[in-house]
Amino acid sequence: MNPAVDNEFQQWLSQINQVCGNFTGRLLTERYTGVLDTHFAKGLKLSTVTTSGVNLSRTWQEVKGSDDAWFYTVFQLSGQAIMEQDERQVQIGAGDITLLDASRPCSLYWQESSKQISLLLPRTLLEQYFPHQKPICAERLDADLPMVQLSHRLLQESMNNPALSETESEAALQAMVCLLRPVLHQRESVQPRRERQFQKVVTLIDDNIREEILRPEWIAGETGMSVRSLYRMFADKGLVVAQYIRNRRLDFCADAIRHAADDEKLAGIGFHWGFSDQSHFSTVFKQRFGMTPGEYRRKFR
């Protein structure tokens, strides 16, 4: 390997790690190219990667050493790329989109010249809009699909408008999630009866979200199953019952805060949705949304 080429590659890899999270990398050929352009506009965090002859990977070691609170939403602009995750492999071409989970290992291959945009989509945003589903990754959304074309246009318009406010950037991300909904659906392998049972459970949770009695034992009794079966049902979807309930309460709190009057007490909102301890409410809210309830309110004012 030409030392000059290897040195240039290591510098580019260092840039990738600073902006996109930890990756290991190797050259597939000495005919390597690598350019990274970043774009941060309020809530939008994205990178344009132009490269060829490169393989980047995230093993469990890299995952543990970096922020995993994101999904990489990959918009292919030109050329081709191969993405691997969860024992799936997909080849994407110009105009296609795919999704990769930053919390799990993945591998990316660019044999020939390729240009793509990677948009960091917050995990909490996906969970807010799709609380009952586990996103499927390394799945190609074809460029011919109207919603894919709309997503590309929305991304380009957002990038070309540096004056977007925090609220407008947040709205753009929310619109992106809605447009990409098909790729965020987990293709279920379970029997229809089991899926209907799961939907019954999550509906029961939402209908009783403010009640103190809302615990796994009560839910199991109301839906005619054992607590163990309830836990297993949620685990099959990558969920934990108690955490799911807490996150749903926090999602309702966040929505209430966005629409609350300026003089409405934040502690009162938390209490209304089942958080009797103000300090605990502030702590878990920040864990989920990256800011305190007060900071969250100011963000939407």
From Swiss-Prot:
List the InterPro entries hit by this protein, alphabetically: AraC-bd_2, AraC_XylS_family_regulators, Homeodomain-like_sf, HTH-like, HTH_AraC, Tscrpt_reg_AraC-type_HTH
Provenance organism:
Escherichia coli (strain K12)
Q: Which GO terms describe its biological process?
A: positive regulation of DNA-templated transcription; regulation of DNA-templated transcription
Pfam families with a match to the protein in the record: AraC_binding_2, HTH_18
Query: Which GO MF terms are attached to this record?
Result: cis-regulatory region sequence-specific DNA binding; DNA-binding transcription factor activity
**What gene does the UniProt entry assign to this protein?**
feaR
- DNA-binding region, residue range(s): 217-238, 266-289
- Keyword Cell division recorded: no
Protein name in UniProt: Transcriptional activator FeaR
